């Protein structure tokens, strides 16, 4: 492999996937290589970590489909992975199949802990949400229906936990379609607790009505450091109950909005108590509309309902913007393979987030597909070697002055951050950039 990589560098490369090399400094800052060596159980000289790096870069490029039907080679892609070739589907499939869900989960936890110490998570609000991707598998499986009028269909569910303040994913879990949202949420919160290491009462978990279950509330209250806030189903019995609350028990907050809170006992759960937050909208009694939320702890209901809970929708925004990284397709039903592939996409998202943050506007506002097409696979350039340094030159880079500020003289920038500028998967070469 090393001989092939050195030969490619000696021959020089021209292509339009040179933008992918902008991620390499972020891999060094993130410690991606050590994570991949640990996950693959192989030393850096072996091919396994490099195949995993190919998966990460495929995710960053939002590349999907059979590898033999793509044209990723001879454009600078394989060299960014430390390989003289683009690995085929069989090699990638074999790599993922060798590693279990537990190993990929440990990789997620290690990545999350690095991101936490780097300040990517505020750790105050955690939004959890299930995403069910339609599956066209011929396997027999439980079907899902989100609308009583629609026909049930096969799904491959993914459950995300997102920091609602920084809009960054903390972790995810997957399951078969038979898994309940409650059981999946318990697994997800156990994973998030290990990543965030939050003191008791610091983190509020925001969930949708699908997670209103005694089992989940019991688990959160007894076995996690988190608090939980979930809306109650807006059914007739609840509306009747809320309308029976005397008006003087509500506190008017501003025109058309009043709140109250009270202890709440679940009939099938002896511990507790929980707390019901009630909001009333409308000025006239005949126009009043009521809504209720259930919380595991007593807290300021106004902030919880008006400031905290609306941030749960950031998880929907995140998924819409970044699902093209590899979370919008069901693929195989082999959970080892799916979990591994989607975890590599999580690493890709972490590197992309850091790159966006460094570049600023307009790049920071682009979704994953736009960023991949316009920057990672949209910059023309060449790759050559000068002494012990790989020099990447861009000829059409937008905002070249801004990019030059962050990327030219990269080895010195990294050393100033106390990061070794030698790239282990590129056999100890350093990396520098030029903008023409």
Region annotations inferred by a language model:
Residues 179-240:
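Domain-level cores of phosphate- or acyl-group-handling catalytic modules
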Residues 39-43, 300-308, 324-339, 356-367:
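Short, solvent-exposed helix-loop connector elements
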Residues 222-323, 412-436:
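An anionic, glycine-rich sequence signature occurring as long contiguous blocks
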Residues 55, 68-70, 88, 92, ...:
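Short, conserved catalytic/metal-binding motifs centered on acidic residues
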Residues 352-384:
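Conserved nucleotidyltransferase catalytic core and NTase-mimicking acidic/glycine-rich helix/loop elements
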Residues 76, 134-136, 179-180, 211-215, ...:
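Flexible loop/turn segments at secondary-structure boundaries
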Residues 1-150, 160-178, 186-198, 222-223, ...:
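Dynamic "connector" segments at or just before major functional cores
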Residues 2, 34-35, 71-75, 199, ...:
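Short acidic (Asp/Glu) and glycine-rich catalytic loops that position anionic groups and cofactors
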